[in-house]
């Protein structure tokens, strides 16, 4: 029995040694793999640290100014509304196109100036009487009081002299009227003189030449 135990122990020792050797061999690659994983992790930390520095540099840089351009502009929501094309089927008021049935507004449109059938305004207003004479002659008017002011010592009154004194405009007819009094001698030669003005001029010793 003692010999059997010793032989069994001797046979078991090599088996145990082999088992421990295989266990150590399995543990060694696991440790190496863990070390390899730890090394890239450390490298990753260093790599990750570099972008942090880069981002810090970017933060330090001045922000880029945003410029508003024409192509950035857009109409407000709901501002652009498509026009309804009526009369293009039952979905778009296809029968009467929103005009109703019969009548002037259904066929075309009310003419400009139509006032609902009542007498139009241009027919209700009264007409201007008379007419404008196409042969009417317009005169520039000069009264005797103005002549007394312009000619305090008397003299010859002509259209050219009155134009030179600024009393009338040139190239237009002149008429002397009798408003005011005259006490000096005037020789009047203008286009027309009223009856009262002629009497006063002659009474003051002057003359009238037409």
From Swiss-Prot:
One of its GO terms (cellular component) is cytosolic large ribosomal subunit. InterPro entries: Ribosomal_uL15, Ribosomal_uL15/eL18, Ribosomal_uL15/eL18_sf, Ribosomal_uL15_bac-type, Ribosomal_uL15_CS. GO terms for biological process: translation. The keyword Cell inner membrane does not apply. PROSITE patterns: RIBOSOMAL_L15 (PS00475). Disulfide bonds: none annotated. Keywords: Ribonucleoprotein, Ribosomal protein, RNA-binding, rRNA-binding. Residues 79-93 have a biased composition (Basic and acidic residues). One of its GO terms (molecular function) is structural constituent of ribosome. Part of the 50S ribosomal subunit. Belongs to the universal ribosomal protein uL15 family. This is Large ribosomal subunit protein uL15. It comes from Leifsonia xyli subsp. xyli (strain CTCB07). The gene is rplO.
